[in-house]
Regions:
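HIT superfamily nucleotide-processing domains
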Residues: 1-140
């Protein structure tokens, strides 16, 4: 397996070098909106610990990510009046991973509404700000 690259985009977000639409943070994880969402409210949950993917993360660090994803899923149901939630996590190129810092996708779903294709469009910043505010309110 390739070594963790500290110059990946999510590591840069953690260091404050890239901006993000943050919805949740604690000592172990950061959750922020995907700027190319597959649906409104599409959130990424990442560990603060450097980890390329599930094959590279310490189990206790992955547990923090899973707990945060659970919290975001519940808030997403409320904030977006969702009918369900899709949670995805990809590992290595053959497994569909594109950004090589472990992350979980949490996507609120509505009956009969398909997800957009991955990375098909960049969302407007105002829409992302509004969706972040909805999620933050549901988390409080």
């Amino acid at each position: 397996m390739t070594a963790y690259d500290p110059q990946n985009p999510f590591a840069k977000i953690l260091r404050g070098e890239f901006p993000c639409y943050k919805v949740y943070e604690n000592d172990h994880v950061l959750a922020f909106l995907d700027i190319m969402p597959r649906c409104p409210g599409h959130t990424l949950v990442i560990p603060k610990a450097p980890a390329r993917n599930i094959l590279d993360i310490m189990p206790e660090d992955f547990a923090h990510v899973a707990r945060a994803a659970h919290k975001i899923a519940a808030a997403s149901m409320k904030a977006f009046k969702a009918d369900g939630i899709t949670v995805q996590q990809f590992n290595e190129p053959a497994g569909g991973q594109v950004v090589f810092h472990l992350h979980m996708h949490v996507m609120p779903r509505h009956n009969g509404v398909a997800l957009l294709p991955p990375a098909s469009r960049k969302e407007d910043g105002k829409v992302l700000e509004e969706n972040a505010a909805k999620l933050k309110a549901a988390l409080s």
